[in-house]
């Protein structure tokens, strides 16, 4: 015989949908409002563990982990967001908030100061520092830069370190400037002693998942970062992505439980 707790377990594991949960809860004596509230509570409590298997429509052998030249293909975006964080990010309400920066401040919208967040480790164990952030911004500047957002960041006049702060001087005031630092082309990567990125293709980041294997245009696998600094994120033990360009094949893979989700339905 079913109980409310049994129904919660089935709903949390995905074995029944929200409608079935509410109908079952009402049948057991709960009011519709109470059943709806319980379903929302279960949905708001993520279950940790397991491996997310994702089949994606787009991906080629030219896919790379250097997001500065990403074409915006689904595969590159999924891999990039799994691996990297930015200096700032866009919150759910559309506002720009600090990410790898602990604070963000400006008095005139021309000089911007970003304090490096303490306690953040790269996937290789190195601690995040201001040189990493400085090298990551400069990677999009200069005649030799191939970055897709080189033009948008041309308004930067100077980038320097001031203790634990990254200081960015603009040619003129721009209150919207931080938005550019949240772009998927502009993740923070490891800098070297010469002020340049150590290896933009290495796929070493600070985000929730550590790259395990990468076969461009074919597949990739990740394991959860045990030292991820963001609480309440990265719930899966691992992620596996596979490129399946044929829509029918993607749907068949989903229906036969070969994957957990697909894109471009």
Predicted regions and their residues:
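Surface-exposed binding/hinge segments that line
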Residues: 105, 149-191
